[in-house]
Amino acid sequence: MPSTRVLVADANSTDGTPDIVMSFADRLLVEVIPGGLPSVGRNAGASRADTPYVLFMDADIEPASPSLIRRAVELAASKHLHCVTTNILCRGGSLTDKLLYASNDVFQYLSRLHRPFATGMFMLFDRRRFNELGGFHEQVHFAEDYLLSSRVERSRFGIVRGGVYTTNRRFEKMGHFRVAKLFISTALNYWNESFFLRDHKYWQS
């Protein structure tokens, strides 16, 4: 891990994130770079990568197993996959929170039959294929992860066993009904890029 380059895209945070990140510089090859909305920050990090794979992870998630990242890379390499994701787990949330995240996981597995869906919380990409696809669409402010992963061939998409822990913060801010409605609308509009380009006020919530 000390030789693994970690790039943290910071969108002008005011909570001391850059200082916290750099406090690990004696143990990790870490760097803070200018960020923005998720698609902008992720593309900025990917443009600096020179490895065969690039892993996108949200700042508020935690791998459920220390071996998760290693297993994701091994799965991608052994099966020549272009994109690998994992299950999303909610620790400490309500039963409704857990059910909605479980529904997300079920949708991910079913997506392998139609159009792959990977959440940006944990998305391992073959860097060459990522660049060929043009990266994340920077004019899309919601579900940019789904829009990109849906362009991956089904045979090149995988889900590694295990998962990452996340919080119920988005449910608390937006409400379960609105999040579920937006998720379903997104799934039904997979073919309609103009839907993704609309302002769904996701980040204003």
What are the language-model segments listed below?
Residues F142-L148:
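Acidic donor-binding loop at a coil-to-helix junction in glycosyltransferase catalytic cores
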Residues I88-L95, V106-F125:
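A recurrent flexible, glycine/aromatic-enriched loop bordering the glycosyltransferase active site
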